[in-house]
Structures are given as structure tokens and as C-alpha cells.
Design a protein with these regions (language model features):
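Beta-strand-centric surfaces of beta-sandwich/beta-rich domains
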Residues: 1-117, 123-245
Length: 245
């Protein structure tokens, strides 16, 4: 299994290949542990609808049976979380990694339209990914590194939970940086002589950061729709020599 994505959709709306859902209920990638929300916070699952799961398998030349299991943990009767955990991917599907480049850099970002609190981050690349960094650039110009993964390993992709959840001011940029080694010095590289672009299979590449956060002014009883301004425009790719400022 390469990865599993999940979501909640309206009944009968499931489509092959879809990955944009109204809410997430956890996921999996190689080396990742279970997803647990802090006390008083939960994933919002409206009544009706369906769970949707995107199952990504990498072919390895043999017939096999999928053996994944999914467990959902609910609050006890009479208990109700007041706050809602949201999920948002920062994705750049326009990456191009030159052949034989030992340290190719890609940068992308998006703007948070409202005040938020960031709880976790997952960085995801394939065999050529070697390094990843996540930064916050607030409206005053202050820039802070909140996650640094100096030795990315495809076989150990962790969900990084911040010891202290991070305040994100409205208008802040969340900036992701990835470095790829597409040279022969990378022992996991399937083909250093090939230019690499975005692709689902492990011998291709990805630039994918998953963030779990909550809106500061959102509660179960008060749910403003911030998804639309967050998704439009989509995350913006930037040339590595012209980072956002």
C-alpha cells in the first residue's frame, strides 16, 4: 500500500480517483502511525452521506490481497467535542526534477484566510525526496520554521504533532520546501537519467504536505464556511530562486 486517503461525501457521489472531500477521517502512508485528535476536538461527520477511501497500490508483479483495516474511535455517549479538526493538503502537481540533479528544490505555499491553529503536519515525497521544511510567513513579515525534516525517508513517513499547537494569523502563508536527489548517488533512485514530474507511482514523484488544523472561531455549533476561500486560488508553486516574501 502506497497510501490511503479518506473523506466524507454526499450519498451516491463517489467517483473513481476523487480526492477532494468535505472532511477527513484519517489516512495512511508508509511508516505512519494512527491519527488521534486532542481531547475536546474531533472530525466532523454529518449525518447521512458516505465514507470515501482512495486506496493507492504500487504494483510489484504478484497477485496479492489487500489487508487494510480501519478503526474509528467515538466519544462516549453524553460526551461531545466542541471543536472541529480540519485537514488540508498543500500540493504542487507541477514539479519538474531534472535528470542527474542531486539537489533540486521546489517551493509552494498557500494563504490562510482566517485565524487558525495548526496541530500536525505530514510531508510526503517518493524515492527521490531527501529533505522537507515547513514555514509560516505572517502578515508582519516574520518568518518561522515550524518543521524541519533533514533526512526524509520514504519508508518512515511520520505525522509530526507539534508539542504546542501553532497559531496562524489570517493572511499568513504556509510555505513548503522539498529537495530531491535525482542522481546516481541516491541508491533508491529508479533512474537518474530520467526527468521526473508529478506521478502517483513510487518511481515518479510527489510534493504533498498534509496539515491538520482548526479554525480559531469555529465550534460544532458555529461552522463558518472557510473551505471555499482556502481552496481558491489553489496552493501556489514558486520557483526555488524566488521564494515568497
Amino acid at each position: 500500500v502506497h497510501h490511503i486517503l479518506s473523506g466524507v461525501i454526499a450519498e451516491g457521489q463517489t467517483q473513481k480517483g476523487m480526492q477532494n472531500w468535505g472532511g477527513g477521517v484519517g489516512g495512511y502512508t508508509v511508516g505512519m502511525e494512527s491519527t488521534v485528535a486532542p481531547k475536546g476536538i474531533g472530525s466532523w461527520i454529518p449525518s447521512g452521506g458516505e465514507f470515501a477511501y482512495q486506496m493507492h497500490y504500487t504494483p510489484f508483479g504478484k497477485e496479492a490481497v489487500s489487508a487494510e483495516q480501519i478503526g474509528l474511535y467515538f466519544y462516549k455517549d453524553g460526551e461531545k467535542p466542541e471543536l472541529i479538526m480540519r485537514e488540508m493538503p498543500l500540493v504542487d502537481q507541477f514539479i519538474t526534477i531534472p535528470a542527474n540533479d542531486p539537489a533540486h528544490k521546489e517551493i509552494a505555499y498557500f494563504n490562510f484566510p482566517k485565524d487558525a491553529i495548526l496541530h500536525t503536519a505530514v510531508v510526503h515525497a517518493h524515492y527521490r525526496g531527501t529533505y522537507s521544511k515547513l514555514e509560516i510567513l505572517d502578515p508582519s513579515g516574520k518568518r518561522e520554521t515550524i518543521l524541519n525534516v533533514p533526512f526524509y525517508d520514504f519508508n518512515w513517513q511520520r505525522m509530526y504533532e507539534f508539542a504546542k499547537p501553532i497559531d496562524i494569523k489570517a493572511g499568513s502563508k504556509v510555505i513548503a520546501t522539498y529537495v530531491y536527489d535525482n542522481s546516481k548517488r541516491n541508491p533508491a533512485n529508479p533512474d537518474p537519467n530520467k526527468e521526473i514530474v508529478w506521478g502517483d507511482q513510487s518511481f515518479e514523484e510527489m510534493f504533498y504536505t498534509s496539515l491538520r488544523y482548526r479554525w480559531k472561531d469555529e465550534t460544532v455549533e458555529k461552522q463558518p464556511n472557510y473551505a471555499q476561500p482556502l481552496n481558491k486560488p489553489p496552493p501556489t508553486a514558486m520557483p526555488a530562486d524566488h521564494p515568497p516574501h
